[in-house]
Amino acid sequence: MLIVIDALLAEAEVLKWRARLEDAEWLDGRGTGGTLSAAVKSNLQLPDTSELAINLGNTIVQKLGVHPLFLSAALPEKIYPPKFNCYRNGGAYGTHVDSAIMVMPNKQSLRTDISATLFLSDPDSYDGGELEIETAFGAQAVKLNAGDLVLYPSSSLHRVTPVTRGQRVASFIWIQSMVPDEAERALLFDLDQSIQSLISEKPADDPTLLRLTSVYHNLLRRYAKF
C-alpha cells in the first residue's frame, strides 16, 4: 500500500528548512548503510546529532502526529527520528530493502513496518532521483512536490535513481505500526476512510455509522500487537 500525503510541510516551511539544509555539512552516506546496502549507496547524509537534523526532525514528527491520513494509514506505535539525505552529481541508491530492526537513539528497538520519504526539493529542480518501489504490480516511480510524503511497506525492495542534474534533498523515516501485518493494516485503512466519508453525511448516532465504527475498533483490537 502506497499512500501519498500532500503538503505535510507548507511551501513556506519547505523554503525555510531547505535554505538551512543547503548550508549544512553533509557526510558520506555510505557510512550509515548495512553491508549490502552500502555497496549500492552513493549519497550524502546529515549527521543525526546535528541541531538542524534534530529540529527539523522534531517538526516532521509533530506534523505526522496530528495528520489524520498518516494516523489512519500507519497506526503508528513508534517513529524513528527522521534522517536526511542528499543526492547530486550522479548520486543514487541501488535496489535494497530496509533493515527489519532499527535501534533508536534512546536504545529502544523499532520494527520497520512502514517507510516514508518526505521530498524537500522541487521536482523540476533536479533530473532523476525517482524513488522506485517494487510492488506486486511492478515498480512504481515516485517523485513528489516538495513538502509531500509517501508511505510504503518497509518490506519492499526499492531504489533511488541517479540524480543527473541539480540535487534531491529528502527526509526518510521508519515507523513501527500497532498493526504489523500489511494486509490487516490496509483493511483497517479502507474501513476507516469509509467511516470518515460517512461522518460528513450522517449524524453521529446513525446506526450504520455506529456499527461500522464498532467493527473497526474490534478489528483493531484483534490485529494490534504491542
UniProtKB/Swiss-Prot annotation:
Residues 78-177 form the Fe2OG dioxygenase domain. Keywords: Dioxygenase, Iron, Metal-binding, Oxidoreductase, Vitamin C. Fe cation binds at residues 96, 98, 158. Gene3D superfamilies: q2cbj1_9rhob like domain, Rabenosyn, Rab binding domain. One of its GO terms (biological process) is DNA damage response. One of its GO terms (molecular function) is L-ascorbic acid binding. The keyword Iron applies. Its cofactor is Fe(2+); L-ascorbate. 2-oxoglutarate binds at residue 168. Binds 1 Fe(2+) ion per subunit. Its EC number is 1.14.11.-. Pfam families: 2OG-FeII_Oxy_3 (PF13640), PKHD_C (PF18331). HAMAP family: Hydroxyl_YbiX. This is PKHD-type hydroxylase TERTU_2553. It comes from Teredinibacter turnerae (strain ATCC 39867 / T7901).
